[in-house]
Amino acid sequence: MLKYKRILLKLSGEALAGNKEFGFSNEVLESFAKQIKDVHEKGVEIAIVIGGGNIFRGISGMEKGFDRVTGDTMGMLATIMNGLALQNTIENLGVPTRVMTALQMPQVAELYIRRKAIRHLEKGRVVIFAGGTSNPYFTTDSSGALRAVEIQADVLAKGTKVDGIYDKDPMKFDDAVRYDTVTFDEAISKNLGVMDTAALSLCRENEMPIVVFNALEEGNILKMAQGNNIGTTIKKK
């Protein structure tokens, strides 16, 4: 039984690198693609926002001497590369997929138009949103929140390397406790670090629930779509 009919799946670029520091892991790409196909075959409309951290992070570019706007623009271009890689892998499994970018690049991908994106979903296509918001100073989490609200998704599902939100770093503390649910206010006031404040605030204002879960574990995207308790849900109350 499916809990969500339309999902915005936010994937980190770093996850695509697998155990490498840079680039793509074919194993991770294929795992994500297979999971997305399984969810798609159940009749779920699925849109994806993917980060670019496996190629370039705008904020870290400042350490290399780039100004923030240039660095963020390079990061947005990295998300397009990731989007194309994921599109190719999903389509190899026979699932029709469209990449839509907020940056004009007509030879490479469709320009993002909200109504057209919704139409693609209604026609049974997976849609990958790339190019961030096209504006610097906004993270791909903010882009994910924005697109989730725009396409009227039922949930913003943030796929990470950990199985939810903890009261402290589970990698460092054995006694870390996972939250089943937290409110938006708690996530912001406690600075839990799951998303930036802009993304959380946008979801709070539009009552867009967020589920944080481990997307690297095979089958978890479908379990999330079915409403299984495999992560942490952030909601208004």
Label the predicted regions:
Residues M1-K237:
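C-terminal catalytic "cap/lid" subdomain
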